[in-house]
Amino acid sequence: MKKIFALLTAAALLLSGCSVGVIGGEDGPTQVYVGGGDGGGALRELDVVLDWYPNALHAFLYVAMEKGYYAQEGLKVNIRFPSNANDAISLVAAGRADIGLYYQQDVIQARANQAVPVKSIGAVVQGPLNIVLSLAEKDISSPADLTGKNVGYAGTELSEAIVRSIMANVGADYSGVQLVDVGFDLMSSMTTGSVDATIGCLVNHEVPQMEEEGFDVSWFDLDDYGVPTYYEGVFLANDTAVEQNGETLSAFLRASARGFADLKAEPEEALAILLANQNEENFPLSETVERSSMAVLLPMMETAEAAFLSQSDECWRENIGWMLEQGLIDRAPELDEVRVNIPF
């Protein structure tokens, strides 16, 4: 899935007697979940901006809402879809949303280069989902196979730095790769033969989607070739919220972790809840693709070494160091500038 978005519209959905609606606003549509709680007391509203339309990555949120876990913590969570690529970080930084789901390396870059006052409060995915993907017929299984090839990407500095790193890792010449800015068209650029491979596709989404469409594909992971392991998704809050609303953020993380525990225990139930909350107009979901996506995500959202939402100083240090080395950031931010570990 891409990290650049169009304006969104949505229709009302009905889920197990609990209504889910979408309302417009200058900061993009909001999915308001009403019901599924204990019905007692006033709830504190939390606006949560997703990185994309609802998909398997967000299933734990919808499970937690459906089962009333946020309400039991005194929270009413409003899910908001981004209207622009950086809404999850920009709206949170400006105090126009409470929590965003965004990307670790973008958080580092925003803090280091622009002093954007946000930090990660929890890692949703413990490793990279981004891959180098190609049709199997292209015979590409490592960076060395990219020499002399056209590689599609979304035109970002980060992707260029990743390609430089993986080529250097295998002793190959970066200048031998022809990077082609294909914008949003990562999959179609491969299937039409415009490029030989792409960087920017996600192993949990584009791989099962292309396989469902009948394509044989191959891919390799970036962190096997010199790119540090990074968190594909992190929850963000702004500095003021971290300083003043720690208990609220802790309650959100606690309820989210309960939703994830249920996702692990009953993935088919979680899939049904997700499908009932999909944005059919703008991003209809395939049950087969989302089931495959969940199977990929579950062991990456929590590992034997890292609990769901945990984040390590080592991961942050390695990514800061790599980004500084690649010229992606102007300075190395302190760890406390980019992450906080909130007990929950």
Each predicted region: which residue ranges?
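Bacterial Sec-type N-terminal signal peptides, specifically the leucine/valine-rich hydrophobic h-region
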Residues: L14-L15
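Short, glycine-/small- and polar/acidic-enriched structural segments
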Residues: D38-G183, M187-T192, D196-N204, W219-F220, ...
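Secondary-structure end/capping motifs
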Residues: E243-Q326
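Conserved C-terminal helix/tail region of periplasmic/extracytoplasmic solute-binding proteins
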Residues: E314-F344
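Positively charged n-region of N-terminal signal peptides that target proteins for export
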Residues: M1-I4, L8
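Pocket-lining segment of extracytoplasmic ligand-binding domains
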Residues: Q105-D106, D185-S188, G193-E280
